[in-house]
C-alpha cells in the first residue's frame, strides 16, 4: 500500500451504530440495577467521544460522573442527573433513557 492509500484509511470516519450505542448504555444501566458495576472495565475501552449520537454521549457522561461521585448509576439516578444538568429534554426526556433498557 502506498502512503497515500494508508492516509486515506485513517481519514475515513468510523462506522456508527446508534443501536450498538444504546445496547452498551442499556447494559450499563441494567448491571447497575442488579448491583454490578462493570463501568471500570467498559470505560477502559469506550470513551464519551466514541458515541456518535449526542444523546447517547450525554447518558454515558452522566454514568461516568455518577460513578466518579461513588453513586451506582441505575436508570432512576441517571435520569435525575440528566434532569439536574438540563439535558434530559434535549433528546426525548426520561422516555428515551428508559427505552435504553
Where are these regions (language model features)?
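Noncatalytic partner-interaction/assembly domains of nucleic-acid and motor enzyme complexes
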Residues: 1-101
